[in-house]
Amino acid sequence: VRKLRITLFLLLGLSSKLFSQEAVESRLRKSEIEQVFLAHNLSLMAQRFHIQQADAAVLQAKLWPNPTISISEVNLWKNSSSESFPALIGHYGKYQQLAVELEQTIEMAGKRKKRVQLQLLEKENARLQFEELLRNLKYDLRSQCLELQILQEKEQLYSSQVDIFQTLAKSFQNQWKEGNVSEMDYLRIESESIAFGNKLNEIQQEKIAKMNAVASYLGDKGAALYISDTIGMPLFLLGTKQEWKMMALESRSDYKIIHNNWKKSNAQLEIEKAERTPDLKVSMNYDRGGNIMRDFIGLGVAMDLPLFNRNQGNIKVAQLELEKNKVEIAQFRIDIEREIEFLSARLSNLESSLKTMDTGFDRKLDVALERYVRNFQERRLTIVEFIDFINNYMENKESILERRAKYLQYKEELTYLIGKDIV
């Protein structure tokens, strides 16, 4: 029995050591994973191009319309009524008629400046869209990392139980063959060993899938990794829900996008109002042989007369869009405040539950496990009593882990709802 106990604890220590060594090569803290994510995530790289495209659109909006040149009244032959003119080039052009016109459109009512202002708001929108994508991806990545941490800790938990029961099963098999224990006792231990092994395999399969999910956020640096941070007793949040609501309204990129959309609608309305004023077209033309003057140079202006179309329909559309944006802002604010209200209640409830828990209970369970294993090896406990304790031990360990992880998940949700990291 004493040899069995020594062997069991050596295996437990060796298992823990091997587990640690296996993970050393790819150990990363969550903060390090985020740094890799920020530098190598392809979705973020692609979104940055939208900001550069918006810069190019601002440049385009600043440009004047090109002048128009037209050449007309060019005769390819002469008839009997043709008059003779001085040659254009050498002896060519004595009977050549020609008209050339150069026209430039001048936009009135500050249309060009108003379009530039709209494109600047589009650029701001592209920047906010990048921030919103970053906010969503960071939340997704952190959630995936937390789930991976849970699976890692469950793997350690079940791995230790597998080691215990495999050692016990081997010992009971030998003792059963020698007639020292019943076959039923041996089979009970063996079945528990198989059950824990199956559960461990399920957890490991889930962990591999979750590692792949985390790696997918890291671009070309995505690989199998082990998160070195552990899930201990979480630090409880400071601040009130009213403070969180104010922070969210100041920081949320999607809320800023809604506000920016209102500004864009206002800028579009100004453009539509400016369209009521017709543009001015200034022209200069040269006419050779087509007028009473042999070489005629003249100036001209042209503009539409706003008698029927004063852009009334488009102005109305822009006004309605502006009103719609106001309603969307109000609704978005209500949604943000409601989400924080409910999440705050869940956080408060779970925080109270965690505070009532004995801070040393986790360690006491581990000490109790060692004691129960030793007592069982020394035949002071029955199999039923031992397995009943093991089941209670696992249930409590998983419950503690899940409650702590749930609080951390709620903290990540609050960070997501506020739009910035909180202590």
What are these regions (language model features)?
Residues 9-19:
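Hydrophobic h-region of N-terminal signal peptides that target proteins for export
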Residues 35-45, 52-67, 92, 100-117, ...:
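A glycine-/polar-enriched beta->alpha junction
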Residues 46-58, 133, 137-156, 174, ...:
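Amphipathic alpha-helical coiled-coil segments
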